[in-house]
């Protein structure tokens, strides 16, 4: 891949340059020292992937991500110091379409990256490379009702790039007494899930927490996949995690969860596929539709990255293709109709 580096610190730039070249599979397309410069360079030389810092002069990484995804969309990996202390910015950038985030590798005495932190970054780059091969970027292809103790309706949501903001928009539409059980599979490292849960909790009156082994979906509660393994139903209404299929590049996989819900959930399912790169979730959404469940895909105009919803639309997996602003109300309408 051709990779752009956006960072204002010379030592960090050199470290990232070495790591990009160390695999022998990638090249540094260009280096920008602030967000505005990156936006301008992308207009004339769009790389396959951008390694984007967050805190920079002139224009920060959040605003640069927003502008790049609006003007010349491409894959963006946030690489910055201390993600834990910048979670709000991380999720805002992901809401604009950044794929993932990782701490910049620590530097040893000799100025080299520590092996563990360097391996984490190169693994993420390799994973994104597989996603890009699976689905090119857009630029390259230029209700309110009483809660039930045992829910009959499962709201299964899948999302990837741009997902946090899209999920927040959907959840914010639900009333405090919403009766459906909600399970979210968002492509995100497990270490960031607690921060995502806290951030989403600011946008919904519903309780929200990471999904644990043997959890049961509860009416009016949001459970979020929180492992590098796949979230599945291991029995009727009981969740768990499994490493299989091990060769699935998407971890946790939306397809795996949707297919599991189609097999095990005893009531009705509303499958929702939001913005994201690649095709994950399309096949599972189709399986839900084939079993008579309501399925919804986000439309092109409101998707930060129109990959996963497009894949669903292409195979006829979605009963409804809706703008983000209409998805929450459509779910509420369907739930009220079934009461």
UniProtKB/Swiss-Prot annotation:
The keyword Phosphoprotein applies. The keyword Hydrolase applies. Its main location: cytoplasm. It catalyses: [protein]-L-glutamate 5-O-methyl ester + H2O = L-glutamyl-[protein] + methanol + H(+); L-glutaminyl-[protein] + H2O = L-glutamyl-[protein] + NH4(+). Its EC number is 3.1.1.61, 3.5.1.44. GO terms for cellular component: cytoplasm. Keywords: Chemotaxis, Cytoplasm, Hydrolase, Phosphoprotein, Plasmid. It comes from the Bacteria. Residues 149-338 form the CheB-type methylesterase domain. One of its GO terms (biological process) is chemotaxis. Residues 2-119 form the Response regulatory domain. Contains a C-terminal catalytic domain, and an N-terminal region which modulates catalytic activity. Belongs to the CheB family. PANTHER family: PROTEIN-GLUTAMATE METHYLESTERASE/PROTEIN-GLUTAMINE GLUTAMINASE, PROTEIN-GLUTAMATE METHYLESTERASE_PROTEIN-GLUTAMINE GLUTAMINASE. Involved in chemotaxis. Part of a chemotaxis signal transduction system that modulates chemotaxis in response to various stimuli. Catalyzes the demethylation of specific methylglutamate residues introduced into the chemoreceptors (methyl-accepting chemotaxis proteins or MCP) by CheR. Also mediates the irreversible deamidation of specific glutamine residues to glutamic acid. This is Protein-glutamate methylesterase/protein-glutamine glutaminase.
């Amino acid at each position: 891949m051709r990779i752009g580096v956006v960072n204002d610190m010379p030592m960090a730039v050199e470290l990232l340059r070495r790591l990009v070249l160390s695999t022998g599979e990638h090249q540094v397309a260009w280096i920008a020292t602030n967000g505005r410069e990156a936006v301008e360079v992308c207009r004339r030389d769009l790389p396959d992937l951008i390694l984007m810092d967050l805190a920079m002069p002139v224009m920060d990484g959040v605003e640069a991500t927003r502008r790049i995804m609006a003007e010349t969309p491409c894959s963006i990996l946030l690489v910055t110091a201390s993600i834990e202390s910048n979670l709000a910015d991380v999720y805002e950038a992901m809401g604009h379409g950044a794929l993932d985030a990782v701490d910049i590798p620590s530097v040893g005495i000799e100025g080299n990256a520590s092996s563990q932190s360097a391996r984490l970054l190169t693994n993420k780059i390799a994973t994104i490379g597989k996603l890009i091969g699976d689905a090119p970027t857009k630029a390259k292809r230029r209700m309110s009702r009483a809660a039930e103790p045992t829910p009959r309706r499962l709201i299964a949501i899948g999302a990837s790039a741009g997902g946090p903001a899209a999920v927040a928009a959907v959840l914010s539409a639900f009333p405090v007494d919403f009766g459906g059980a909600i399970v979210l599979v968002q492509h995100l490292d497990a270490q960031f899930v607690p921060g995502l849960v806290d951030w989403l909790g600011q946008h919904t009156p519903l309780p929200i927490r990471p999904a644990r082994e043997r959890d049961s979906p509860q009416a009016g509660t949001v459970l979020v996949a929180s492992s590098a393994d796949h979230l599945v139903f291991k029995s009727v209404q009981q969740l768990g995690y499994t490493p299989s299929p091990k060769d699935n590049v998407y971890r946790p996989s939306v397809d795996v969860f949707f297919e599991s819900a189609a097999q095990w959930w005893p009531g009705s399912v509303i499958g929702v596929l939001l913005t994201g790169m690649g095709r994950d979730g399309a096949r599972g959404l189709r399986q839900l539709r084939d079993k008579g469940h309501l399925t919804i895909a986000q439309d092109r105009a409101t998707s930060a990255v129109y990959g996963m919803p497009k894949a669903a639309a292409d195979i006829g997996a979605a009963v409804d293709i809706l703008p983000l602003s209409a998805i929450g109300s459509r779910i509420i309408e369907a739930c009220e109709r079934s009461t």
